[in-house]
Structures are given as structure tokens and as C-alpha cells.
Curated annotation (Swiss-Prot):
Source species: Wolbachia pipientis wMel
Protein name: NADH-quinone oxidoreductase subunit H
Protein keywords: Cell membrane, Membrane, NAD, Quinone, Translocase, Transmembrane, Transmembrane helix, Ubiquinone
General function of this protein: NDH-1 shuttles electrons from NADH, via FMN and iron-sulfur (Fe-S) centers, to quinones in the respiratory chain. The immediate electron acceptor for the enzyme in this species is believed to be ubiquinone. Couples the redox reaction to proton translocation (for every two electrons transferred, four hydrogen ions are translocated across the cytoplasmic membrane), and thus conserves the redox energy in a proton gradient. This subunit may bind ubiquinone.
Organism ancestry: Bacteria, Pseudomonadati, Pseudomonadota, Alphaproteobacteria, Rickettsiales
InterPro entries: NADH_UbQ_OxRdtase_su1/FPO, NADH_UbQ_OxRdtase_su1_CS
Gene: nuoH
GO cellular component, one term: plasma membrane
Signal peptide location: none
């Protein structure tokens, strides 16, 4: 029963967050472009996400004549479900209890497993299958080309993401996401400075991994007419749409855990610790989501060759070099977990 309550406690706010992220994006883009944005449905346009959802619900789903029906329907469901189940291991706070006279920090998470990092990486890697299935089953040249682009792009940047996460794991000595946040919080400040350059690379790689601007080549409107989801309408299209925004929130949560201190306040002031950790966690995610949208409004789209060159010839060598550098520095200074055993 407690597990079900925890799942609902995560799932319901997450679905509402995904819905209102679309509203937030339209409002931010409108402000940057000196427009009003959604302002008709409800006060300040706050009911616009529900109006969009109702519109998509009552529209008729159209399946192309030559499409593989089962795979065509399964692809958006797979994409959306994978974006949600990754949250099972994301810690959004912690509580401190006393056992045998010692303080023990217990993360607030649905499944506090010791291989949480591997779980998140595995689930995020599976997302490419939904895109590939959608492109192939649509029997459309535009959709298939968009799916191939997406697969190549996601696989290319997953290599850098994996190496950067490996550097964080080496630094903290754990694959448990909650323990990782606590370990990073207790480390010297210079370790955070050492991780900062690859933190920037990690965030840029997340833009490519989530197919967001300026790396949204799989759904380049001018070339591929929306890309891999061009044949979708009604709720199947909405599931792809929600999956993309759910992945944005998940990517921001991963960035927060790996590099921004998770639920801890940014500065060591006792006054800041009176604010609940959940508030800090959500605030950091919102700031990162704003940066996602800000980048979309200001930076032009990369060419495909530039995208591949950046991933393989720039990010990959830097990531490999930084893993070696961090390991050497931590070993030399005696801060490498397990080096003094």
C-alpha cells in the first residue's frame, strides 16, 4: 500500500508538471518574442493544457493504410512509459533519523536500489526504440529518416553521457543516487569545481539526448515535417509530445543529482536549510527547464554534420580525458573512495 501511495505521489505531480511545462514553454517563448502567449482559456491561460488535452482526446486517431498497426500504436506508449518509470529511483529529498546514536540519512525515493545510476542510464537508452519503431512502422520516408537521425544522435551522445556519469561515480564511490547526493555534499569544494567543465558537457549532451533545440534534427520542421511522428495524430501524438517533455524533466533531475547537489541548498547557510529539500530540488529543476527553453528561443539549429562532429570529435575525447584526470587527481590527493583501504 505504501508503495502505491509513493508511486501516486510521484506520478500525479509529474503528469501535471509535464502538462504545465508546455504552458511554461509557450509563456517563456512568448515573453522572449514580445508576445502574450496563452491567455484565453482560464485566468492567465492556466487552463490551456487541459484544453489541449481535451482537443487531442476527442480527435480521431488516423493510422496510415500501409502502417504496421500494432507497432504503430505501441511506439508512443513505449516512449511515454519509459519516461515515467525512470522516476522510480530519482531521490527528491531525504530524512534524517538517529540509529545507535548516529545520524542516518534516508533518501525519499520509491526504489532505493544500489544500482540507480545504471537503471536510469538503461531506461534512457531504451527510449530510442520507441522512436525507431515509430519511424519504421509508419511506412513513411520522412518518419523513417527522422527515426534514423534520432537513433544516431542519441547513441552518439550516450557515449559521452556514460563517461561523464562514470566520472561522477568514481568521485562519489557509489551507484546509489541518494548516496551520491550525500557524498558530493560532503566533498571539498574543489571537487565540484573539477567536475564543473564536464557538467556543462553533460547538460549539452542532454539537449541532444532529449532531441531538444539546437539538436532537434530528428524533427526538423523545415526538412522532415515533424520527423518520426509525422504520421501520428490524436492521443498517440500526445503521448510522444508528453514523453518528450517528461524526458526534459527527467534530464533536469539527473543534472540536479549529478552536479547541482540534489535537494541540498546551494550555499552553506543555516537559514537556507530551513527550506525543505523538496523545494530546492524542484527549484533547481525549474531553472534548468528555463535554460532548455531559453536555448530554444535564442540558438539556431545545428547542421547534422556539426551535431555528429561535436559529439564524436569534441565531447568524447574531453570526457575520456576528464575521467582519467579526475581519477588521477583524486588518487593523488587521497580523496578517491576506497583508495585508503
Amino acid at each position: 500500500m505504501n508503495t502505491l501511495v509513493n508511486i501516486l505521489f510521484i506520478l500525479v505531480p509529474l503528469l501535471l508538471s509535464v502538462a504545465y511545462l508546455t504552458y511554461f514553454e509557450r509563456k517563456v517563448l512568448a515573453a522572449i518574442q514580445l508576445r502574450h502567449g496563452p491567455s484565453v482559456v482560464g485566468p492567465f491561460g492556466l487552463l490551456q493544457p487541459f484544453a489541449d488535452a481535451i482537443k487531442l482526446l476527442i480527435k480521431e486517431p488516423i493510422i496510415p493504410f500501409r502502417a504496421s498497426t500494432i507497432l504503430f500504436i505501441m511506439a508512443p506508449m513505449l516512449t511515454f512509459i519509459l519516461a515515467l518509470i525512470a522516476w522510480a529511483v530519482i531521490p527528491f529529498g531525504a530524512e534524517v533519523i538517529v540509529e545507535n546514536g548516529q545520524q542516518v540519512i534516508i533518501p525519499k525515493v520509491i526504489a532505493n536500489i544500489n544500482v540507480g545510476v545504471l537503471y536510469v542510464l538503461a531506461i534512457s537508452s531504451l527510449g530510442v526504440y520507441g522512436v525507431i519503431i515509430a519511424g519504421w512502422s509508419s511506412n513513411s520516408n520522412y518518419a523513417f529518416l527522422g527515426a534514423i537521425r534520432s537513433a544516431a544522435q542519441m547513441i552518439s551522445y550516450e557515449v559521452s553521457i556514460g563517461l561523464i556519469v562514470a566520472a561522477v561515480v568514481i568521485t562519489t564511490g557509489t551507484l546509489n543516487l541518494g548516496e551520491m547526493v550525500v557524498a558530493k555534499h560532503n566533498m571539498p569544494f574543489w571537487v565540484d569545481l573539477l567536475l564543473m567543465p564536464i557538467g556543462i558537457i553533460f547538460f549539452i549532451s542532454l539537449l541532444a539526448e532529449t532531441n531538444r533545440h539546437p539538436f532537434d534534427l530528428p524533427e526538423a520542421e523545415a526538412e522532415l515535417v515533424s520527423g518520426y511522428n509525422v504520421e501520428y495524430s490524436s492521443m498517440p501524438f500526445a503521448l510522444f509530445f508528453l514523453g518528450e517533455y517528461a524526458n526534459m524533466i527527467l534530464a533536469s533531475a539527473m543534472m540536479t543529482i549529478f552536479f547541482l547537489g540534489g535537494w541540498y541548498p546551494p550555499l552553506e547557510f543555516s537559514l537556507l536549510y530551513k527550506i525543505p529539500g523538496l523545494i530546492w530540488f524542484v527549484l533547481k529543476i525549474v531553472i534548468l527547464l528555463f535554460i532548455f527553453i531559453w536555448i530554444r528561443a535564442t540558438i539556431p539549429r545545428y547542421r547534422y554534420d556539426q551535431l555528429m562532429r561535436l559529439g564524436w570529435k569534441v565531447f568524447l575525447p574531453i570526457s575520456v580525458l576528464w575521467v582519467i584526470l579526475i581519477s588521477g587527481v583524486l588518487l593523488f590527493t587521497g580523496n578517491l573512495p576506497g583508495s585508503n583501504v
